Amino acid sequence: FYVRLVSQYLYAAQYDNATVQAIMNEALKYQGWEYVYGGASPTTSFDCSGLTQWCYGVAGITLPRTAQAQYDATQHIPFGDAQPGDLVFFQGTYNCGDYITHVGIYVGDKRMYHAGNPIGFADLTSAYWQAHLICAGRVGH
């Protein structure tokens, strides 16, 4: 059990889709970095939408800057239909006036990679994320 628990954080993620692989190769460079509100590049570190905008941009996909704008720019799909590389959107994670307050990258197995504090993986089956989850969003490639 312990080996499985630790190994989930040590493996080099492999994805079937080359675009998703490029997104995650970039994203994993920042694992463990501090969350910085308004951060949108490696020189500043990242907030949630800054991380997604940067990593998708490196893979050649343009995303808007904020979580709300990214939500508005994606095709909304039920979370159960999410595939690695889709975005996952949340509401009410803090009071900012927007409907959508957080975004992460769906990586499969009901997990996301996001700019939490620190940047890294999160289990989407946890009570916290389930309480705030709105949907997944498919980015047009």
What are these regions (language model features)?
Residues 1-34, 130-141:
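Intrinsically disordered, low-complexity
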Residues 18, 61, 77-79, 94-141:
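Aromatic- and glycine-rich peptidoglycan recognition patches
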Residues 33-84:
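Catalytic cysteine-centered active-site loop
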Residues 39, 67, 92-94, 140:
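Short, well-ordered turn and helix-capping elements at secondary-structure junctions
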Residues 83-86, 134:
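Conserved acidic residues
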Residues 87-89, 105:
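Hydrophobic beta-strand signal
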